[in-house]
Amino acid sequence: MTDLIRQGALFLMSEKCYDNYFLYHNFLDVPCFKALLSKGLGLAIIAGSVLVKVPQVLKILNSKSGEGINIVGVVLDLLAISFHLSYNFMHGYPFSAWGDSTFLAIQTVTIAVLVLFFNGRKAQSGLFLVGYVVLMYVLNSGLTPMSVLFTIQSCNIPILLVGKLSQAYTNYQAGSTGQLSAATVIMMFAGSVARIFTSIQETGDFMIILTFIASTFANSVILGQLIYYWNKPAGVKVKDSKAKKPKTKKDD
């Protein structure tokens, strides 16, 4: 039983931290506390990521519509997630630092396929899925040099910003967040904030840290829109602009 507890604890902390906590009872060790907190947050984010975009998927399936969802934004978001996943996986970073990207990628590609399908592009939705599977094989099988993966990861910030902000622009034009799921938006924002801390602790990779800072900013914009447009039906912005249109002589 003691061995099982030890093995479980060592999954969350280093042997040095285990000794500090369980042998010397030094519970005020700051570096060990930070490492344990980071590992715990990372695992919590991974657990949450299993379902983070499921509300969005269900909302599309129930309405049989991708209204208000910018497909370009979804595809760019998918690329950013996939490049991040591959970069971390091939670098050999701890799974707790990037494991959520695996589940986010699966759910995001599902959203992209559903939006294409319900927009009447059924053949394209199938081709898109096949193309994505091929891309992931190329990125994660060792066929892609590490130098290329680093370059791709460095491009993640503009890809991520363009993808998220194009969705924000779509929301602005529509005067509504359409079929965007509030639960998904909130969890994505919270996850990106937590990932800044876990990335500092577990990888120290400046490129990854900067990526999550950019992600937090972009997610905060969409979260702000969600709050602003909460009780506003689609088309309010357009109607308001028409209502303010000055009268012409014909109207008189």
Curated annotation (Swiss-Prot):
Residues 34-100, 157-211 form the PQ-loop domain. It is a multi-pass membrane protein. Keywords: Membrane, Repeat, Transmembrane, Transmembrane helix, Transport. GO terms for cellular component: membrane. Pfam families: PQ-loop. The chain crosses the membrane at residues 41-61, 69-89, 98-118, 126-146, 148-168, 180-200, 207-227. InterPro entries: MannP-dilichol_defect-1 (IPR016817), PQ-loop_rpt (IPR006603). GO terms for biological process: oligosaccharide biosynthetic process. The keyword Cytoplasm does not apply. Its main location: membrane. Belongs to the MPDU1 (TC 2.A.43.3) family. This is Mannose-P-dolichol utilization defect 1 protein homolog. It comes from Drosophila melanogaster (Fruit fly).
